[in-house]
A protein has these predicted regions:
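A short SAM/SAH-binding and catalytic strip from SAM-dependent methyltransferases
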Residues: 1-16
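Envelope-exposed proteins and targeting segments
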Residues: 15, 66, 122-124
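Core SAM-dependent methyltransferase catalytic element
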Residues: 84-132
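Short "lid" loop at the C-terminus of a central beta-strand within the Rossmann-like core
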Residues: 5, 37-41, 76-78
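Short alpha-helix
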Residues: 52-73
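A short glycine-rich, Lys/Arg-flanked "PGG" loop and its adjoining helix->strand segment in the class I
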Residues: 15-28
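Flexible, surface-exposed loop/gating regions in the mature catalytic domains
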Residues: 1, 23, 46, 79-96
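Conserved beta-strand signature within the Rossmann-like core of class I S-adenosyl-L-methionine
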Residues: 29-38
């Protein structure tokens, strides 16, 4: 199980490597579950994952390239109130409710209370299997 890590791997340029290493570590029939902040399919995917959001199709493609089969998805971590379009990416929402670390002017008008009503991010929950 990996929880909210894919965007970090994308930012570091080693997302494909991570999926390949999971594949190598698992026995045939082994299961990999991925929970990640979900970017709507209609939005443009930054290959560096800079907003913290990743499209399901993008994650499925990475897993497939590594050799995994897609098994199922779940909406257990879904949040339909999250548009994934926030000034500081996923870090705009709780629990971070963050401001930019650089102290930019944009932070002056930021009102974290507006984002608390959204709640935490919408998350994809995906299950993959290493073929037998």
């Amino acid at each position: 199980l990996t929880f909210r890590n894919v965007h970090n791997w994308m930012g570091g340029g080693y997302a494909d490597q991570a999926f390949e290493e999971f594949y190598a570590a698992l026995k045939p029939g082994g299961i990999l579950c991925v929970v990640e902040h979900r970017l709507p399919e209609t939005a443009s995917q930054d290959p560096r994952g800079s907003t913290g959001y990743v499209q399901e199709s993008y994650m499925k493609d990475m897993a497939k390239r590594a050799g995994f089969e897609f098994v199922a998805s779940s909406e257990v971590n879904a949040n339909p109130n999250d548009t994934a379009d926030h000034p500081f990416g996923v870090w705009t929402l709780p629990p971070s409710s963050g401001l930019p670390e650089d102290g930019s002017e944009e932070a002056i008008d930021f009102e974290p209370e507006l984002y608390k009503n959204i709640g935490e991010s919408d998350r994809a929950t995906l299950k993959f299997r290493k073929p037998l």
